[in-house]
């Protein structure tokens, strides 16, 4: 059994077009180093998967919470499809082991980079939608995401920076600092990377479309790390 057969068995779906599945797990760095192979990266599938994920999650929230206000549903959806949550979902189904990376990106730790894993999860959703249709996407989410919604994991949408501050300052005074590490992407579609440092120790890193979102993402990762110590 090769890795793609293993992956299909793991997710519970057979792909009619296995090349589409491979593309979902192909980072641009791999394409750059294998130009003779005529492979495609996963960026277009990520674009599609992002929209499919928003639609399916929105539909689920709309039907599950018939009395919930639009504003609250919007916040809930944002918490479900944000980068830290997508990374959690990707890790739950062991997607990182199947990602095709260039040698440089691999050495730089790309396989565990949060933004990369979140992108792979979205690109897989895009590929699954194209190959199997929306119903199979819903079936997959019923296994990976919807149970967490049912358990109430996203009912309390929070300010993660405030929550982190409350957690670490319960017993003592501590110094919490946020650093913007850099930015990537064109001017119209920038992504910022941030880290949160508590008493000199890096507790979390994250990224977002704005500096504030990146800091919130870093704080959420730090909270998850503290909770699962």
Curated annotation (Swiss-Prot):
UniProt similarity note: Belongs to the ribonuclease III family.
CDD domains: DSRM_RNAse_III_family, RIBOc
Major localisation: cytoplasm
Organism: Listeria monocytogenes serovar 1/2a (strain ATCC BAA-679 / EGD-e)
Active-site positions on this chain: 50, 122
Domain DRBM: 159-228
Subunit and partners: Homodimer.
Cofactor(s), by name: Mg(2+)
Localization per record: Cytoplasm
GO biological process: mRNA processing; regulation of gene expression; RNA processing; rRNA processing; tRNA processing
InterPro entries for this protein: dsRBD_dom (IPR014720), RNase_III (IPR011907), RNase_III_dom (IPR000999), RNase_III_sf (IPR036389)
Any one GO cellular component localisation term in the record: cytosol
Top EC class, one word: hydrolase
Alphabetically ordered keywords of this record: Cytoplasm, Endonuclease, Hydrolase, Magnesium, Metal-binding, mRNA processing, Nuclease, RNA-binding, rRNA processing, rRNA-binding, tRNA processing
Keyword Hydrolase assigned: yes
Signal peptide positions on this chain: none
Enzyme Commission code(s) on record: 3.1.26.3
Binding site for Mg(2+): 46, 119, 122
Name of this chain's protein: Ribonuclease 3
Reaction equation(s) it catalyzes: Endonucleolytic cleavage to 5'-phosphomonoester
PROSITE patterns to which the protein is assigned, alphabetical: DS_RBD, RNASE_3_1, RNASE_3_2
Disulfide pattern: none
GO molecular function, one term: rRNA binding
């Amino acid at each position: 059994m090769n890795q793609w057969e293993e992956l299909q068995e793991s997710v519970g779906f057979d792909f009619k077009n296995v090349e589409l599945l491979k593309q979902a797990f192909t980072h641009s760095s791999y394409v750059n180093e294998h130009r003779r192979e005529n492979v495609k990266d996963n960026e277009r599938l990520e674009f599609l998967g992002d929209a499919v994920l928003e639609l399916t999650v929105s539909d689920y929230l709309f039907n599950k919470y018939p009395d919930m206000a639009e504003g609250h549903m919007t916040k809930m959806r944002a918490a479900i499809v944000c980068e830290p949550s997508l990374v959690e979902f990707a890790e739950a189904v062991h997607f990182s082991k199947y990602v095709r990376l260039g040698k440089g990106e691999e050495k730089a730790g790309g396989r565990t980079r949060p933004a990369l894993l979140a992108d792979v999860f979205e690109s897989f959703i895009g590929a699954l939608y194209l190959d199997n249709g929306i119903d199979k996407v819903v079936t997959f989410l019923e296994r990976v995401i919807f149970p967490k919604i049912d358990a109430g994991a996203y009912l309390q949408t929070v300010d993660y920076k405030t929550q982190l501050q409350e957690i670490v300052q319960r017993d003592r005074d501590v110094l919490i600092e946020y650093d913007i590490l850099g930015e990537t992407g064109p001017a119209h579609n920038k992504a910022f990377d941030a880290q949160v440092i508590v008493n000199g120790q890096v507790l979390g890193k994250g990224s977002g479309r704005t500096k504030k979102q990146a800091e919130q993402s870093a704080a959420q990762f730090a909270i998850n790390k503290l909770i699962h110590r």
